Structure formats: structure tokens, C-alpha cells
Amino acid sequence: MIWILLVIYQLKHFIADYPLQGRYMLGKFKPWPDFVLPLLSHGLVHGVFTFAIAAFFKPLSVALALGLLDMSIHSVVDWIKANPSIGGRFAALSKNEMKSILSYVPTLGETEVKSKFGDQLRSNTFFWWALGADQLAHHLTHYLLIWMILS
């Protein structure tokens, strides 16, 4: 049963973090207080999925508690990743963002932009570490939830 739940939680994580995370939920990267509702709505999607999964194994009150736990942990982890003074300071720039910077500062060439904003480019090691730490925290949360469901 543990292997089935591991696969279910991988699918849950993918569906909730990618196809179901719409433009509104990406508002979690906005400054205070505008990020709060988008972040909580994204966490709620994770909580609803966990509630639905846990309801097959546990009483509804326990399933609800597990859903709220998942929502809370997911929201905090994503807040840490998105917060500009914590993980968000390592945000990576896409090619379009790079073009946007070049359009605002037309006197700079690509080399100058890279030297000024190099710590924010996709080659930024810390961006990938922050993203990896975020995913690790989510997976460890899933292991905890699976353990709680099966206990």
C-alpha cells in the first residue's frame, strides 16, 4: 500500500503544482499582503487532495486534519521559496525577462546585463538549490502524511 500512496502523492503533487496552479495562484510571488490569498488558494488545492486521499483510510475528521496540515505546510514552504528575502531572492530570469531588462536599459548590452544581473540568471546555483530544497520539503511532507495515513 505504501508504494501506491507514494505514486498517488507524486501525481497529486504534479497536478496541484502545475496544471491546477493558475495565473491567480502565481500571485504568491507578489509583495505583502497581495501574496496571501493566492498562496493560501494554492495550499488549499493541496489540502483538498490530501483530504480526498486520506478519507479512503481515516475518519473524515482525521482526513480533514491531514488536509489542513498539508495545506499549512505547503503554504509555508512555498512562502519561504517565494519570499524575496529568503528563497525568492534567487529568482531566475527567463529569456523574456532578460529581453525586458534590455528594453528598459537599452544602453546596456547582454554582457553588461549578465554582469549586473548575473546572480539572477538561470545558471544561478542558489536558484536551483532553493528549488530543490522546496521540492525536498514537499516530498518529506508527503512521506509524513503517508506515514500518518497508514498508522
What do these predicted regions represent?
Residues 1-151:
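Hydrophobic alpha-helical transmembrane segments
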